């Protein structure tokens, strides 16, 4: 037996200036064991705390279920109400067989006889492609492909094309809409899923399941409800709660630790909503910055400013959930390493970790939004205008306010989660977590 009184496992605690766990004296105890249980709460008090938490979570679940029931979209939703093609048109698929129109010369000649277009004009913005799905399946036809897609076109590229019989009078009835991306996107998704499961194991599987449930809430509730005329803020609050309940409890299980993270997330959502409501009004952000927004306002009668507020809340949900889960786990691990730590010391130790979170999230969201808005920023930079005026104009101002509000919500959620975790981690025996 070693005669050294200081265990090597306690060195990190001493380095941090935290008290080391003391050995439990032998003999009979009238109370519960302190080595694996709460230090200052008896069984009755711990039970009451769990009941209070159960009531709070139950109220959140009940409110969410009622909100889903009341706001659930009916047949009035505008999903699919706008035709994608003009009358007589249809969407098909094609594969480029050649970027040289001589490969489909017979089809080009037939079209020029009908519409009188010169063959040399076809060569400027068309490629030869075999129609693989839709009107004219099996034919090799010239497909209109202009601009950047034409420059990047290669034999074998798979296209989504629009067939418009009226267009035959001025050129080819087939025109480029987009690329078929099922294969590369599907491959990336499979690689991502495999890596998550391989690295995170059971937790990874559960997190993917939670993501699927949250995505289902977004796809089958939030989007249809917003397009059916329900109040955007109410839909966002209910949808956000449903997504967070699924993400937290499905991925991490039901425990006081995960409930702590959930409460921290709720606090962050509330703060973000309040900040977004104030920020959009104070900065006079209307959300009416492009044709897509104007289309929504005209067809769905959606308040664009409120919709912008909702987007700010949804944009920060993922990172918010990440920091609250990690903060709660950090405090729990501090308690497990040294069950003698007081709530104040647990909070202080947790905030040391939280400061690292804050330091990283300061640029995480900023870089994410900057990357998304890069073409817009470059276009704005072309203007002969003061930099500050450019940054505070239109869509760029929306991105800046969105980033600031999401970041403020994250920063405030960290101490809130840490405080809740420091108060609750001593309720549950260390070995139970």
Enumerate the language-model features and the residues they cover:
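Hydrophobic secretory-pathway targeting helix
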Residues: 1-89
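Extracytoplasmic/periplasmic regions of membrane proteins
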Residues: 75-183
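Membrane interfacial helix motifs at helix-loop boundaries and amphipathic/re-entrant anchors
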Residues: 168-181, 223-235, 280-309, 380-403
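Cytosolic-side membrane-insertion boundary helix
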Residues: 171-211
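Transmembrane alpha-helical segments that form the functional core of multipass membrane systems
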Residues: 191-194, 202-294, 302-315
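Pore-lining and gate-forming transmembrane alpha-helices of multi-pass membrane transport proteins
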Residues: 261-269, 297-314, 360, 364, ...
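Helical hairpin unit composed of two closely spaced alpha helices linked by a short loop
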Residues: 322-384
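Hydrophobic alpha-helical transmembrane segments of membrane transport and translocation systems
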Residues: 368-370, 374-433
